[in-house]
């Protein structure tokens, strides 16, 4: 059975799989069987039911895996290919999110708008260090879940149109899009899934003059640790990370 975008995002159907079709980089529609794979603690997901994440297995290309995020700001996808094929992405192309672009991982996107790809790389690098510190093994066959305290600078929030906590959903939607892709990599390579903690939005900031992160970027590690210790508490998360709009994280 095929369902449209509204059906896929229906929280009442989140425990069931659904078959959807999305275009690949060659312009051919491919089918995937998808199911919900939230990046949020259940309490956080309950607060933001309109922001969701899904995983899917390929039906047209049996070896492919889909990661899909959805919010009122639109959808983003990442398709993992096997046999050395490049991964593929779908992202909004137009400002109003009515036009989307499909591209392969090795292609330079040129005129496409700013995307979270840089954030993906930064998050992966930071988490890889933490994973190594914790001695997590990738080959034991058990999917592990860790609690992520994700903070963002005011500049990051402002980039996505959020200038106050009333617009927190704009920021969380952007973070969710990055987390969806990053979790795809970690689930595939390390059997590891990261869930945003319930109060991660407490360390989202909106005013550059008052947020706790100052330049140079080399200050951020210590400032992030101090912020998470003060606001979140060290017993309440496993990994802490920061997004900034200037290329740091």
What is each PLM-predicted segment?
Residues 2-154, 186, 193:
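Propeptide (latency) domains of metzincin metalloproteases
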Residues 96-249:
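Fold-level signature of zinc-dependent metallopeptidase catalytic domains
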């Amino acid at each position: 059975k095929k369902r449209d975008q509204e059906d896929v995002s229906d929280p009442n159907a989140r425990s069931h799989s659904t078959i959807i079709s999305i275009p690949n980089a060659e312009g051919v529609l491919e089918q995937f069987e998808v199911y919900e794979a939230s990046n949020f603690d259940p309490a956080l997901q309950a607060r933001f039911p309109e922001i969701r994440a899904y995983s899917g297995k390929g039906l047209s290309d049996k070896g492919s895996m889909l990661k899909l995020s959805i919010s009122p700001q639109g959808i983003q996808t990442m398709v993992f290919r096997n046999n050395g094929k490049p991964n593929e992405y779908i992202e909004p192309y137009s400002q109003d999110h009515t036009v989307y672009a499909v591209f392969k991982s090795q292609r330079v996107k040129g005129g496409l708008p700013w995307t979270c790809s840089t954030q993906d790389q930064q998050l992966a690098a930071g988490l890889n260090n933490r994973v190594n510190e914790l001695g997590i093994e990738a080959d034991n066959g058990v999917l592990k879940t860790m609690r992520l305290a994700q903070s963002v600078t005011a500049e990051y929030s402002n980039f996505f149109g959020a200038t106050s906590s009333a617009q927190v959903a704009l920021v969380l939607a952007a973070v969710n899009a990055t987390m969806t892709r990053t979790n795809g990599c970690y689930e595939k390579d390390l059997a590891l899934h990261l869930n945003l903690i319930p109060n991660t939005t407490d360390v989202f900031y909106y005013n550059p003059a008052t947020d706790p992160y100052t330049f140079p970027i080399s200050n951020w590690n210590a400032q992030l640790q101090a912020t998470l210790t003060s606001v979140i508490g060290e017993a309440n998360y496993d990994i802490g990370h920061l997004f900034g709009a200037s290329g740091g994280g």
